[in-house]
Amino acid sequence: MESESVKFGGPRELGGALDLITQYKLLPHHEFFCKRSLPESLSDAHYLHNLVGDTEIRKGEGMQLDQLIPNASLSSRDTNARIQPFVLDELKEAFELNDTAPVELPPAEKGAPTTVSKSKSESKDKDRKHRKHKDKKEKDREHKKHKHKHKDRIKDKDKDKDRDKKKEKSGHHDKKRKNNGTEDADDVQRHKKSKHKSSKLDEMGAM
């Protein structure tokens, strides 16, 4: 009877003592990846050849996991494991897609054609900029108005001060004039009285 280490393909191959394939319901994936034969595009590519050298890759029933590791019989301490970077060109060659032709949908499935227009975000940005510009202009206008008002107020105050000064000066002159006028009237009256007295005396003397 074959021992578990030699036998391959059972559910305990990947999980050791536990049947992880059944436990995690991976049987369809296990069958897809492990039971099907290797595609020719992969088997002929340089990608796998660089990884395993001339070792024949067997996939499916009877495949041993240690066939991918060269000199598996030697212990890992004796071998210097070296990690090699992937060559992207070889990976592209290995996993090249076959269906590279453009896909054409029937007119019924295409739907309505979309017109090339500016995105909403662009139009929103433009609106925001326009609003900001408008707001800035309005603020500048308001600021200028306030400045003019302030200047006008200052001018008005200055004008009022000038008027008050003029009034004070003119009032002072008027008082002088009034005083001068009353003094002149008094003088005239005195002069008249003296004339009147002198004329009366003359009349009396003549009699």
UniProtKB/Swiss-Prot annotation:
Keywords: Nucleus, Transcription, Transcription regulation
UniProt-annotated location(s): Nucleus
UniProt cross-references to InterPro entries, sorted A to Z: Mediator_Med19_met (IPR019403)
Biased composition (Basic residues): 127-152, 168-179
Keyword Lyase: no
GO terms of biological process kind: regulation of transcription by RNA polymerase II
Cellular component terms per the entry's GO annotation: mediator complex
GO MF entries: transcription coregulator activity
Domain of life the protein comes from: Eukaryota
Disordered: annotated span: 99-207
Chief subcellular location: nucleus
Membership in a protein family: Belongs to the plant Mediator complex subunit 19 family.
Quaternary assembly: Component of the Mediator complex.
Primary role: Component of the Mediator complex, a coactivator involved in the regulated transcription of nearly all RNA polymerase II-dependent genes. Mediator functions as a bridge to convey information from gene-specific regulatory proteins to the basal RNA polymerase II transcription machinery. The Mediator complex, having a compact conformation in its free form, is recruited to promoters by direct interactions with regulatory proteins and serves for the assembly of a functional preinitiation complex with RNA polymerase II and the general transcription factors.
Protein name, per record: Probable mediator of RNA polymerase II transcription subunit 19b
